[in-house]
Amino acid sequence: MSSASRPDRQQGVVITHPNRDKPVVQATRATVVVLLLVSAALVLVVTVGGWNLLEGAIPVQIGYIVVYLIFAFFAARWNRGVLPISAVLAVLLGIFAAVAGPSWFARDKSGFAEATLNSGLLGLLTLLIVPVQILLVTFALRGFSQGWNVELERRDGAAGEDGGRLAPAHPA
């Protein structure tokens, strides 16, 4: 949305986000996006690799993949609202993965239906989801506390004679 179409914006006022310029905040955002993408990729590999054995879990896993990709998009655009939801979903997925991982190793014996990928590999990938989700929770909550949404209003130096000083505080 342009500032011309928003009636609450004053002429000559520039909105800045000072916390977004800090290297630690940019690194946190990049880490959250990477962890969301890695999580989606791991769930995708486990879903495709065990497609014929997962039965009822397929819609849930596809849902996780889609939601994590959407959240990665929004986190890359500095939307911190997805961070606590990402953390909650990561806790749930981490619990599911911790419970499901050993069962893939149990299927590595004769008499069980074969998955597309080796059951041992699927077990390893499923258990690998757990530390990735722990990291995602940690970095998502860290990013949420960094104040990505903090805005400062300042006068545009070219628009007024006050030299770009801060505009009077307005509720956001």
PLM-predicted stretches and their roles:
Residues 1-39, 135, 139-147, 156-172:
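Cytosolic juxtamembrane helix and N-cap/initiation of the first transmembrane helix
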Residues 51-55, 76, 80, 102-109, ...:
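Transmembrane helix-loop junctions in multipass membrane proteins, especially transporters and channels
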Residues 43-63, 95-127:
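Membrane interfacial helix motifs at helix-loop boundaries and amphipathic/re-entrant anchors
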